Amino acid sequence: SDNLGARPSRTLAQHFENTGAPFMAEVAIRTKADRKGGHIVRDKATGRLILREMSQVHPDDKEAAQDITKHPYFNTNSIWVRIDALKDKLAECDGVLPLPVIRNKKTVNPTDPDSEQVIQLETAMGAAIGLFNGSICVQVDRMRFLPVKTTNDLFIMRSDRFHLTDTYEMEDGNYIFPNVELD
């Protein structure tokens, strides 16, 4: 899973209902550790919010994109979508959302930088924020974002630092990942 902090929230569901927005993305305050993650920007041409992943940023704009004072929020990968709005958008797009393709350069063996170079193609569901007029973001506590992207992250989540509550939520209390490097 990409975010073990994601879970249903009555408070967020009520907020989403009250806004009437077709799409809502949960965002959290970026720290220096989050500089390379996706963040929300406003499209100058359309005024819509869009998700911008670092691999989509032009090299000349990388420094500004990583500036956490200029772009203070990052995408937690938790979204809320009105079913009727999604149904209408899918009908408009012949059943396929036109999400941008993200191109990531990687190596076949991530532990060996000299292994064969490959290109990973992916889309991010959070990028759908740019498809709906009136999309919004809601700032959430850091505890709603517990990413597991590497074996190091999984090691931390499976350690005794975190525990599963009676309501099946991962809990730690401080929600700041220690730096762990496995051999």
Question: Model-derived features: where do they sit?
Answer:
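Divalent-metal (Mg2+/Mn2+/Ca2+)-assisted nucleotide/phosphate chemistry catalytic cores
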Residues: 1
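Acidic donor-binding/catalytic loop of UDP-sugar-dependent glycosyltransferases
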Residues: 4-14
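Left-handed beta-helix
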Residues: 14-183
